[in-house]
Regions:
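Short, polar/flexible loop-turn hinges at active-site or ligand-entry regions and domain interfaces
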Residues: 29-35, 125-128, 193-198
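Short coil/turn segments at secondary-structure boundaries
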Residues: 27-29, 199-206, 312-315
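Metal-dependent nuclease catalytic cores that hydrolyze phosphodiester bonds in DNA/RNA
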Residues: 1-117, 144, 151, 165, ...
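Glycine- and acidic
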Residues: 27-28, 120-125, 237, 241-245
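Short, charged, low-complexity amphipathic alpha-helix
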Residues: 179-251
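Extended, charge-rich alpha-helical segments
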Residues: 84, 248-251, 255-325
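Charged, terminal alpha-helix-loop-beta segments
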Residues: 69-73, 163, 211-213, 217
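Mg2+/Mn2+-dependent nuclease catalytic core
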Residues: 72-192, 313-314
Length: 325
């Protein structure tokens, strides 16, 4: 047993390991930023509301409908070799303790024991639907195995706008997941000797802790810079179709540039980065921002008999968007 994660990592990174097995064998560093800190705060607010009976987001109320016995922040471990699962504890803060090399730990935001359901909260950005989402499938599998369920409801709740997506996993779906997990494990083992030949870029790169050391990202950046430089000053002479193709490439480049920024930030978390000229260095600096808690203010206004919508303001602006032709 070990306190370190095995090559399968944790449940939240399972999609990336399935798509890009080489990334599991590169150096890595966690990415901490304002967005992730806010996401953690949103999760904690809902957790406290569930546990202590406070005001909850509508999507959380929906998830709890019909349930009187539930737990928050439940930690499990699934063994891909044996197919077994165990509950490690609750509210552990990702401190999973001793794990075997073939175990995958994960934390489930909400487990409804009397309705056989698991839920994961997301802040805003959409992810794959529950029955196609490795993290949610693993959560459903773990809870079902530990609690003896033949089927389990798996749900994602988006806290920013109270949208949700729900699916069901049957015992057959669980068998399929276990086969998938074993295939992922085999792929990761095969990538150990030559990680660079088992890399693949895609949406899963966004939060990859190995991005700063990834040769696939370096090669992609070099190719795209040359293509976009050729477009400078020529847009007016191009056909509309060529401009459309340039727009698609630009979007991909912007996504890549954002990932490079994150990689630089990860490196700067570990050491000062000297800038050209020798007079400045790039370094991480702790910052804070104070703002009103809109959620709390809306609750307070409602308590006072005021409609929070009276105090909303709409700002109009133009935005370049893709629409159906």
């Amino acid at each position: 047993m070990s306190r370190r994660l095995g090559i399968m990592g944790s449940g939240s990174g399972l999609e990336r390991r399935a798509r890009c097995p080489g990334s599991a064998h590169l150096p890595s560093a966690p990415d901490t930023n304002e967005a992730s800190a806010q996401g953690t705060a949103n999760h904690e607010r809902e957790e406290v509301a569930i546990d202590l009976g406070g005001v909850k987001s509508p999507v959380v109320e929906l998830a709890l409908r019909g349930s009187n016995v539930h737990q928050t922040e439940v930690a499990y471990a699934v063994d891909v070799e044996t197919g077994t699962a165990r509950q490690i504890g609750a509210k552990l803060g990702r401190n999973y303790g001793d794990l075997s090399p073939t175990e995958i730990p994960l934390t489930v935001d909400l487990v409804c024991l009397d309705t056989s359901a698991v839920w994961d909260w997301k802040s805003r950005k959409r992810v794959a639907d529950p029955t196609e989402n490795y993290q949610l499938r693993l959560a459903g599998y773990a809870a079902a195995k530990v609690n003896g369920w033949d089927s389990v409801t798996v749900g994602i709740g988006y806290l920013s706008d109270n949208a949700h997506a729900v699916g069901t996993m049957t015992s057959l779906d669980m068998d399929v997941l276990l086969a998938d997990l074993r295939a992922i494990y085999a792929g990761l083992k095969a990538a150990e000797a030559s990680p660079a030949s088992h890399l693949a870029t895609g949406p899963w790169c966004e939060y990859c802790p190995a991005m700063a050391w990834c040769p696939a990202q370096t090669n992609l950046a070099r190719a795209m810079v040359g293509e976009l430089e050729a477009a400078v000053g020529q847009i007016e002479q191009w056909t509309p179709e060529a401009v459309g193709r340039a727009h698609v490439k630009l979007k991909a480049f912007e996504d890549l540039a954002e990932r490079v920024k994150k990689a630089i930030r990860l490196r700067a978390q570990r050491e000062f980065i000297p800038l050209p000229g020798g007079k400045k260095v790039l370094a991480m600096s702790e910052q804070s921002r104070t703002s009103y808690d809109a959620h709390a203010m809306a609750e307070r206004l409602s308590d006072l008999g005021e409609d929070p919508k009276k105090y909303m303001k709409t700002t109009h602006f133009a935005k370049l968007m893709e629409k159906k032709a």
